[in-house]
């Protein structure tokens, strides 16, 4: 469950995601291959 401020960005492992308008989903994330 994602909880974020709409319009802001947040980290998901090594990727940066933009928060969706509902504050409960990612509108889009960078797709870098994160080291394990």
From Swiss-Prot:
The keyword Transport does not apply. It holds the Pfam family Pacifastin_I. Residues 1-36 form the Pacifastin domain. It is found in: Secreted. The keyword Transmembrane helix does not apply. Expressed in hemolymph. SUPFAM superfamilies: PMP inhibitors. It comes from the Eukaryota. GO terms for cellular component: extracellular region. Probable serine protease inhibitor. This is Serine protease inhibitor 2. It comes from Melanoplus sanguinipes.
């Amino acid at each position: 469950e994602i909880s974020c401020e709409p319009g802001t960005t947040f980290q998901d492992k090594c990727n940066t995601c933009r928060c969706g308008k509902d504050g409960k989903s990612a509108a889009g994330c960078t797709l870098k291959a994160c080291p394990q």
